[in-house]
Amino acid sequence: MYQQNAAGLAGTAFLMKSRGGAVRRRKVTRRRPTGRKTAARRRTDALRKAVRELIRRVKPRSPRQTGARSAPKSPESSYDFLRSGTPRYERDSRRPPADRVVMIDRESVWKGAQVPQPPQQPMWFPPWMMQWQHAPSRPCRAVLPAPVRIREEEGNAQIFKDARDVAEGNYLPRRPADGEADRDNRVRNRWSLEQVLRTLERIPARGRKLILTGLFGTAVGVVLDLLLGSPLNLTTRLVRLIVGFVPGGNLILNALDGLGYLMSRFPSNPLQITYDPGFQRLANSVQQNIPQGTAEALAHAAEQQVGEGFARNLAAAMSYLVGSAPSAAPMAIPLALVRPFRP
């Protein structure tokens, strides 16, 4: 057997001494079972005892049975709750008794009586029979989605616009009218100002007067009605020139330009725009912002460009207007005093 020498034992003892000495096997001392209880246990027992005593004092005692006692239950009667009240014929037999068989004669059938039928039970078919009795399903045709439409302008649109301006002689940059550069998806084909003026010249005089007076008021509407409906057949450029020089003329031109949105919705009957709520909002906005002397200045400019015949027509229109509508007399007085401004 291998045995260490003295040097080895000394080294081992030194190591064990440096680490705290050898590990000894100690016996675990166990406490002896005593009958003493802890203080917490004694308090708990005392509390339980007090609660039991309180319940015994408060709870009333059950009265004693003075009569004869009932016989003890037999062991069979303890299983009565397991027995069902269903008759035997319903539990063991599938056929109901004779008194429960429903018999209906011809008279009852004639009166509308029906035999109670059992509920329909789902039937099971093998898979091959299911495929046989159903028609073969036809595959649906694949519907290709419509291509996406991308709304974008052409890249060379500005080139064409510049060429058109050069051809027309519009070398200076022109400020577009309000609403001209807008994009409206609801109205694809918006009428231009020339098309609006041309349409107002061609429609009947009564409808034209109704649209213009409803949009610009009585005084300005009558003057514009005489300009557009005169037998002189004025061009749209001349009408725009006369209206453009007047204070508030840009507002009138912009309103007529905005009228192109409304007239494009009703191309067959332009008189329907008078019932449109957009037309009413436009008329309220224009009549609130138009200057006071626009009608007199417009009549003055038209008299200078057209001549003395315009003043006579205006006087006749004002006399008819005052006679038919007395409430329009204060607005017609300044226009009735307009005289030819020719030398």
Swiss-Prot record:
Bias (Basic residues): 22-41
Highest taxon of the lineage: Viruses
Compositionally skewed regions (Basic and acidic residues) per UniProt: 42-56, 88-100
Region entry Disordered, spans: 18-100
GO cellular component, one term: virion component
Principal subcellular localisation of the protein: virion
Compartment list: Virion
Keyword entries, A-Z: Virion
Protein family (similarity comment): Belongs to the atadenoviridae p32K protein family.
Protein name: Structural protein p32K
